[in-house]
Amino acid sequence: MGRSGALRVWSLGMSVQLFLPLVLCITCIHGLSPPQPRVLLSFQELQKTPSFEHYTLSEKAMDYRILFMDEDQDRMYVGCKDHVLSMDINNISQNTLKIFWPASTSKVEECQMAGKDPTHGCGNFLRVIQPYNRTHLFICGSGAYSPVCGYVNRGRRPEEQVFQISSRAESGKGRCSFNPQVNTVSVMLNQELFSGMYIDFMGTDAAIFRSLTTRNAVRTDQHNSKWLSEPVFIDAHLIPDGSDPNDAKLYFFLRERLTDSSGNTKNIHTMVARVCPNDTGGQRSLVNKWTTFLKARMVCSVLEEDGTETHFDELENVFLLETDHPKGLLIFGVFTSTSSVFRGSAVCVYNMADILTVFNGPFAHREGPNFQWVAFQGRIPYPRPGTCPGGAFTPHIQSTKEFPDDVVTFARNHPIMFNPIYPVGRKPLVVRTHADYKYTSIAVDQVTAADGHYQVLFLGTDKGTVQKVVVLPSNGSLDEDLILEELEVFKKQSPITNLRISSKKQQLYVSSEHGVSQVSLHRCDAYGSACADCCLARDPYCAWDGLSCSRFYLTGKRRSRRQDIMHGNPLTQCRGFNLKAYRNAVEMTQYGVKNNTTFLECQPKSPQASVKWLIQRDNDRRKEVKLSDRVVSTNHGLLIRSVHSSDQGLYYCLATENGFKRTLAKIRLQVLSEALVSALSNKQQSPWSWAAALHPKALVSAFSPAETLAMHQYCKERKQMQSLQNIQSPMRGDLGKLKPLLDHRKSRNRRNHLREE
């Protein structure tokens, strides 16, 4: 099959040939081992910082979801099992308002009798929180497999501290899924609710539904696999299309199981569907059904030089980054692949202009003996299917009921676009393979640094951590991405369910089944206390101000601010800021015993640094330490399993990061013989006398001058350490009273001791 043919098949994902390129590409990207974060902070370490807050109702898992954030009123609304929460986005651990809204006892009993999970199914799990008007929210929950909805009065101003249900519960069917484990996505427009969910108890009837309306309810064509095929709804957004508000469309991001051309195999693919909010259905056909429904496939793949593609087909989360122009809107998607052959995650970004081009392109059509998908070549009726009534292109048509019959018929039979939507540059921003985690959610911030604009990605994982990633452009097939930090934002490991970002507050909000956490977008001091550390971090939020690594502001007034995100070169940015200190580490002395194990500790602050060990013997030139089964370099230092006399010397621990080299440790290893150590350790029980064999005169004659010198040095250092400990921890009680007596007896027996150094 030619390249064009391959693209034709992949555009709809209808070919079993997808498996072959996947297998071929595994070896291509096998070498892309996941990078390490420069800073890793545990939950306990985060709790000690002022930039972290955490909230939970219980130690039990309650499936928290951040469902709506209102930055104008500084409130964030969270749904979980049997509760609705209103949080202060300045500090989520303070002034949190709660509503207890459980499912009725009878519904819980019916749910359990139906065999549903009593813990994760038979409760009222909040899945919809939407602003209804200035004072009220519209909320829906699963209601123990019997969806319920209601209205919450939140007051006009947050200082009123009003938060209570103001109406009786009403049916949530067509507004919220029965099963809380099945996603529900929703958007409220002009007091009309648009939802993507499953409409029945069994979870077989999926629909994009408009409810809560004075007009007729509208939904997708029921049990029509061309429209929806076992969808998993991910998110929904209203996106403008030009200056006319009537042309704006609702986009639903989802993944589906689509049947291939043979009709036997179902492959998972990511799709984006759209409808016009003012669609009221057809007059004779598609009555109370969308007449403007269209969908297209979103591709996130790695294209190799031989033309094969490795696909990440399962969409997990999306984030919309607004720009100055509606068509310049960027859509970030987190994708995974969980096949038995290959497992990984990727982040792809799409331009809204490219999405509009696909929806304005050819429609998909089946023809030929094998019902192969091809581009429709016939006449397309007017107005073009998918066009909104009353918009810039159809000002004379005020309702979809006025559409000609051929338009409605065509829309029913051709809901799929032929061309797929490719990411910017036809490549992912981030790829993770062979990692022990996968990405689940994303939030993005546009940051202005001294050398340009950067997109900082906050990526939630299924391990309960959040990674901060900056992507740097490169000339290769993939951009270079740096994990600036990884944060354990929850005490217990569980997948991140939501991320919400506030650029205004410079805060990130994270939810999982165990609670909600709030963390600052930047912790510049965590990178280190020196200019080189700050520069090597390459964090767009941070810069060296001459004294510390601190928040960067593009004011142009402080020339001493040092920042280099693109290159991260301390040699050019940190001149005059004590770079020599990195080349001249303090020399330490360490003793090893011949034929025993010793460990030279050296751990770079950054896991992104590579370490090399050098040794200098007797003022000779420094040489690289030869590693073997006996001498092993670890993440924490150099392990010598069996010390030889030839191991004695001055060891240098050199770290290299982004081309910048520095000496982290200088350790002088003194090798002691086993006989010497045995002599030092085999004193009699009495502290005032020596055994005959260990008399000082016998010791002096037993060892070489070098060993005697090493012994004196060892004893001197031990005495200095003990003196320091005595100063820090003075003796108390009976031992303190006994010390003068011991000193007196010691002076009387001084002739029996080695002269103190």
Residue ranges, per PLM feature:
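Disulfide-stabilized extracellular ectodomains of secreted/luminal proteins, especially beta-rich
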Residues: 2, 6-501, 505, 510-518, ...
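Extracellular beta-strand/loop-rich beta-sandwich domains predominantly from IgSF
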Residues: 446, 588-592, 627-650, 655-659
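Immunoglobulin-superfamily Ig-like beta-sandwich domains in protein ectodomains
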Residues: 478-486, 610-639, 646, 742-749
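Extracellular/luminal immunoglobulin-like beta-sandwich modules
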Residues: 522, 612-614, 650-675, 726-729
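Conserved Ig-like domain signature around the intradomain disulfide
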Residues: 530, 598-600, 609-611, 646-656
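Type I single-pass or GPI-anchored cell-surface glycoprotein architecture
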Residues: 546, 551-575, 656-659, 675-757
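Proline-enriched interdomain boundary motifs that mark the N-terminal boundary
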Residues: 577-586
